[in-house]
Amino acid sequence: MEDKIKFKQWDNEEKKYYLHEETEEDLRNFLIGTLETYLDDCKDEVGNPDIIERWSCKVHGNEDYIKASISNCGEYLNIEVSLFDKMSVTLMAHRDGLDVYNLLEIGMIWLHPNYLQYSYQLINVIDHVAWVLGCEKSQYMIMNPKSFEMGFLFYNGFDLNIVDMDGFIYLEKHYRVNHDFIRIKGQESNAPTEG
């Protein structure tokens, strides 16, 4: 018998959460269907992103981890969703496997420049996933490695500043007490400059 993943789902009529159980396949199909809807809205501008290349759904302890990878004419939009104790949904999208730090853990969306104009739709996707799975909040920031000066996110007692300098991504941990920081050199960003 196939193991099922437990999650809470909000009932609008009853105004309460109910515990649901779905198979790994059903949960995966829900996520991919949601992503397909989002990408369908983008296809007029970026081509027809109708190829689902890879997918997986895994459970690690109390954390449910779902990953879908969509290819559009050779350009990849990798989307990962992690459900932390059903309290929040964090989604990361990044280009061509570029992974700067653990953006999933600190709640960031890494978006290819071609998709930035559709960022509001992607936020709706995250909120919808959070709502369906009974999460109390969704966490996200939208970053473009060639068009932002500074991004801020408060996380785990630190102010994390993501800084783009000379095509490199840096992570600064600012301690709130004395404002000292540690700068860590990230991976080179080769995303095209907009405009």
Locations of regions flagged by a protein language model:
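Short amphipathic alpha-helix that is part of the acyltransferase structural core
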Residues: E2-I70
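A conserved beta-strand-loop-helix scaffold within acyl/acetyltransferase catalytic domains
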Residues: S71-V100
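A short, internal acetyl-CoA/4′-phosphopantetheine-binding micro-motif in the GNAT/acyltransferase core
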Residues: G107-Q117
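Conserved acetyl-CoA-binding loop-helix of GNAT-fold acetyltransferases
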Residues: L116-A130
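Conserved beta-strand-loop-alpha-helix junction that forms the acyl-donor binding cleft
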Residues: Y140-M150
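Conserved acetyl-CoA-binding loop of GNAT-fold acetyltransferases
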Residues: L153-V163
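C-terminal "cap" of GNAT-fold acetyltransferases
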Residues: D164-G195
